[in-house]
Design a protein with these regions (language model features):
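Serine/threonine-rich low-complexity intrinsically disordered regions
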Residues: 69, 88, 206, 226-231
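ATP-dependent adenylation/nucleotidyltransferase module used to activate substrates
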Residues: 2-185
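Charge-dense, low-complexity polyampholytic segments
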Residues: 124, 196-203, 221-229
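Secondary-structure transition/capping residues
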Residues: 123, 158, 189, 217-220
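Short, charged low-complexity linear segments at domain edges
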Residues: 170-197, 234-241
């Protein structure tokens, strides 16, 4: 949607991971003037934020990093010293994981709403996808319907007839679908980071690494980043490509 001066403006949440980076590629390809918004919320490591900076620089978009500390709230392996268990691939997504951060999307989207109003943006883009809403309550389609209704009542711009809408274009996409889209859009996948752990290489054993590699395998592509440990299923896949 165009704003008053004819330019399409949007805020796109950017963590530096596969999903949000592919999303930024998509939003840029649609012709939006984008402000990429990242959050330093007290997560265990800054590796993903480093990737977010590189992705934003690659696309030459304005990039804001908001510092908010969610650690006092607790309740998540991403902000507390709670171990992230190794879960079998087939069991990932069956329960709400320990990496769920209480009310994170509501908090982050509320900040994005303020930025969208100030920048006269009509859209807030978030990279939630099909796998997310199987495990995270704030990534479900009904959640986004509800938050859009709330946001329509929450700002001066919207109550005066303006429009700000949260959109999750990848909501029905699997990881493999996202990888295919990223390849099509020439997203710089080698700059992205999905691992729950910091370090020079992704661990290859956390849920996020396994799901990422499974997505590349099912998409028929090879992940360009390096891993400390390569899961057996992905090794087998790589052997079939040689």
């Amino acid at each position: 949607m165009q704003n008053r001066n004819g330019n399409m403006r949007a805020v796109s949440l950017l963590s530096g991971g596969l999903d949000s980076s592919t999303l930024l590629s998509l939003v840029v390809s649609r012709g939006y003037e984008v402000v990429a918004l990242s959050f330093d919320y007290g997560q265990r490591h800054s590796r993903e934020l480093d990737s977010a900076r590189k992705i934003a620089e690659y696309y030459k978009v304005e990039h804001k990093i908001m510092k908010i500390d969610l650690r006092p709230i607790g309740g998540s392996a991403l902000t507390e010293n709670i171990s992230v268990p190794d879960v079998d691939l087939e069991n990932i997504g069956k329960d709400i994981p320990v990496t769920y951060v209480p009310a994170r999307n509501t908090i982050l989207l509320s900040i994005a709403l303020g930025l969208a109003e100030v920048t006269d943006s009509s859209k807030i883009f978030i990279g939630a996808n099909a796998l997310d809403y199987s495990g995270y309550p704030d990534c479900r389609p009904e959640y986004f319907d509800s938050i859009n209704e709330t946001f329509s009542l929450a700002t001066k711009k919207t109550v005066e007839g303006g429009h700000i809408e949260v959109e999750a274009p990848l909501l029905k996409y699997s990881k493999a679908d996202i990888v295919r889209l990223a390849v099509k859009l020439e997203t710089p996948l080698g700059l992205t980071w999905s691992c729950y752990k910091g370090g020079k290489k992704a661990c290859g054993v956390c849920d996020s690494c396994k799901l990422r590699l499974k997505g590349f395998m099912e998409a028929g592509s090879e992940d360009p980043i390096e891993y400390e440990t390569v899961p057996a299923f992905y090794k087998k896949y790589l052997n079939t490509r040689e």
